[in-house]
Amino acid sequence: MLEARDLYCERDERTLFRGLSFTVDAGEWVQVTGGNGAGKTTLLRLLTGLARPDGGEVYWQGEPLRRVRDSFHRSLLWIGHQPGIKTRLTARENLHFFHPGDGARLPEALAQAGLAGFEDVPVARLSAGQQRRVALARLWLTRAALWVLDEPFTAIDVNGVARLTRRMAAHTAQGGMVILTTHQPLPGAADTVRRLALTTALVLYALRANIDLFYTPGEILYGKRETQQLPAVGQRLRVGGMVMPGSVRRDPDSLKVNFSLYDAEGSVTVSYEGILPDLFREGQGVVVQGTLEKGNHVLAHEVLAKHDENYTPPEVEKAMQENHRRPQRVDKDTSS
């Protein structure tokens, strides 16, 4: 099992992610998604030990990665955005370099990758897509349990993507693990791949079965704009919205507090037990992390606020722009 625990990463004085926690068990594969600059490649480098996080830890089989680096790397196949092959060698020679004991299997691996007839052509004479296939032919040779692949389908045609996806599915069916970044759909695998969506500067969690991680109140009520899919009761999620004026109710004998979050589409109720951020204010934007309960209620385990009286969570702002309006300020709780 690979585990990311409370990962925090900054680049160029910008927070890419913080509090990022998830696990990848035997037989699972995870697709990391996000816009340019969201930190997808950086996350993969942290997971493979090629870079160190600014906070948090990566664990392999229950042990900190830094303590079991050698055994981890024996279990890892890493193919980065660049093919990582030697252009002066042929396709066959490149595979032999990585898999010297598998000479008899090299032609079949290259054929599976779509390179039949190109085995002895110098890689420098191959197209970008063919060079990528040389690197990906290792998927038919490696005995590594964990595959971490950064944009593996770059310059690969539709048939090649389908063939590679089938290979990944076979690997996970045999108990392997796959983590990849890609903007392309995974033919035949949409129901089995977990998606982890990175949104700059937010705490993110890997959820099950292709559910986006962030919701606005309106999306909880009516579903995502693209799919109309509602979050499931019991699902861990993040909700960003404005704290409804007049909705905050504090228990005088404990740290329990209830309030409502709203956007232009509606409102949801939130309960939380703990110390609220100093910057928590009615009428201002916050992001809560928690679990969705019945009745569109969120049981929160963390509340985040930002030092800006005009702050609106970025995802809420985007949703409002798509709807051509911002959330209206309200004077009372209208969630009931």
From Swiss-Prot:
Residues 196-336 are annotated as: Cytochrome c-type biogenesis protein CcmE 2. Residues 2-242 form the ABC transporter domain. It comes from the Bacteria. PROSITE patterns: ABC_TRANSPORTER_1, ABC_TRANSPORTER_2, CCMA. Keywords: ATP-binding, Cell inner membrane, Cell membrane, Cytochrome c-type biogenesis, Heme, Iron, Membrane, Metal-binding, Nucleotide-binding, Translocase, Transport. One of its GO terms (cellular component) is plasma membrane. It is a peripheral membrane protein. Residues 307-336 are annotated as: Disordered. ATP binds at G34, G35, N36, G37, A38, G39, K40, T41. Residues 1-199 are annotated as: Cytochrome c biogenesis ATP-binding export protein CcmA 2. GO terms for molecular function: ABC-type heme transporter activity; ATP binding; ATP hydrolysis activity; heme binding; metal ion binding. It catalyses: heme b(in) + ATP + H2O = heme b(out) + ADP + phosphate + H(+). In the N-terminal section; belongs to the ABC transporter superfamily. CcmA exporter (TC 3.A.1.107) family. Part of the ABC transporter complex CcmAB involved in the biogenesis of c-type cytochromes; once thought to export heme, this seems not to be the case, but its exact role is uncertain. Responsible for energy coupling to the transport system. Heme chaperone required for the biogenesis of c-type cytochromes. Transiently binds heme delivered by CcmC and transfers the heme to apo-cytochromes in a process facilitated by CcmF and CcmH. This is Putative bifunctional cytochrome c-type biogenesis protein CcmAE.
